[in-house]
Amino acid sequence: MINRNEINENDKWDLSFLFANEEEYVKTINAIEIKTKEFKKYEKLELNFDLFKETLNKYYEIMEDLEKVSYYAMLQLETDVTNKDSNKIYSICVNLATKVSNTTSYFMPKILKTDEKKIQAWINDPELKDKKIAIEKILREKKHILSEQEEKILANYTPLYTSYQSIFSALTNADMEFGEINKHPLTNSTYTLFLQNEDQKIRKEAFLRFYQKYKNNENTLANLIISDFKKNHFIAKTRRFQNTFSMQLFSNNIDKKVYTNLIETVNENLPVLNDYYEFRKKVLNQEYLYHYDVYVPLTKGIIFKNSFEDACEKILKSLEVLGNEYTKILRNGLLKERWVDKYENTGKRSGAFSAGSYNGKPYILLNYKDESIRDMFTLAHEAGHSMHSYFSIKNNPFPHYNYSIFEAEIASIINEQILAEYLLKNETDTNKIKYIKLTQIDDMISTFFRQTMFAEFEYIIHEMISKEEPVVKETLTETYMNLLKKYFGPSLKFDELSPLECLRIPHFYSPFYVYQYATGIAAALSIYKGIKENKKDAVENYIKFLKTGGSKYPLDSLNITGVDLTKKATIENTINIFKCRLEEIKKIFQ
């Protein structure tokens, strides 16, 4: 693998949009230090309108500058973790962020202590219109903020909140060793690769060896996740929420019906998913599918070759349906302004991401390979995130630009759908068509159905804890096994180790997070349907949604596009698309 200094400059992202040189960066660091010290002087002063305005402006100035230097440091480090200078810069930023947090921490509680009618009157002043929504969101939290002493007690316990997840990570990623299969290491990250092996014996060996280690540690792992669930319930009750579910949906003002509608509608339509596994069983020519058979590819030996530039052209051509404004900006970013850090080098972070900050550009990290069509889809996916960030930044003040995780996957999934449609229209090779269509189906299973199953599991266990019902290891595994059988259907035979999968899902340590993947694809496919069918204002309203950023709550933003996630029809649309794609691929395999 080549070193960072061997990568062509044109293949690296251009961070000069953040800082032209190191001198400018150091100057901003010093300015933040000075502003942070000055901010301390406001702590003891009683708020009036002028002081409130001044303090608010200073606070967001500091936060904007801090975001800028932090992104610069993070982006430098992600391209080469072995670089001493990058590590030093990152360390400086971490320390600075801690200092800023400690010094400014008094400010939001101070706002909440001030008479709410006063604050409401102040934020209605035209001079504060660019901060109004952010403050209204803070005021909404007021009834869940405790006394100063109680808040201090909870704050002191904050490091312990993540301790269960930290122990889980250390145990599963460091202490648990899975050995080798055919001289290749079996790890948490390579496990899925083994399940994609054509040889069922290798898949079975990987499955049994992997989950036997989880079996050996099942009591510890079960206690960790149960304790984490109970910790979240304690925090929720302490903050005057009914339960963890209510607390987690509160900050984004998500209607509980969004969650329950997702699970109920998917459950009503599970025969469609069961049908897919029956189809997979027939293609693999097996009497039964086993848990280790669900990831093996149904096509093989298919080679796509696209240079980065070729991939960009295909993506841009496909996205012309979103209008000239969208493609012109994206073309400039991908091919001229160097938003993308393209290729792998020693010390570079694996995978891909989009990182948009209010200043600079919405950068994209890739490890692009010409022979991987997956990498072309990854580029389209991350470009969706970056364009969402671009439009959000250009159309909102700093306090309102950050959109929620709930909305984040919509733009990226829409890009993938549009690209796939374009490739299928222009492809004549049956095997390549098979591959693209199967990839679409696999992605829908992993993003929509699987995440809904996880969401249902979480909901059941958290509800039991909320009702103070006993939850033990067997509660987890029995609940999960029932869900596996329900979602996968009669075509699959499960091993007694299968339900231990519930003990290895890191996202369960972030309560009620995974459902957002499923609602994200449901919203995206609903918007995509309107665009594909040339519905009036579909594209215009979608771009309006992207430009909304964090200026509205997620469901209100989505309302611009006509998407309502509380309605069965929105979820059924996703299931119907899955059903159509399954019928299409069945015909190709006949």
From Swiss-Prot:
SUPFAM superfamilies: Metalloproteases ('zincins'), catalytic domain. It comes from Borreliella burgdorferi (strain ATCC 35210 / DSM 4680 / CIP 102532 / B31) (Borrelia burgdorferi). Its cofactor is Zn(2+). Zn(2+) binds at residues 381, 385, 388. The keyword Zinc applies. This is Oligoendopeptidase F homolog. The keyword Hydrolase applies. Its EC number is 3.4.24.-. GO terms for biological process: peptide metabolic process; proteolysis. GO terms for cellular component: cytosol. Keywords: Hydrolase, Metal-binding, Metalloprotease, Protease, Zinc. GO terms for molecular function: metal ion binding; metalloendopeptidase activity. Binds 1 zinc ion. Belongs to the peptidase M3B family.
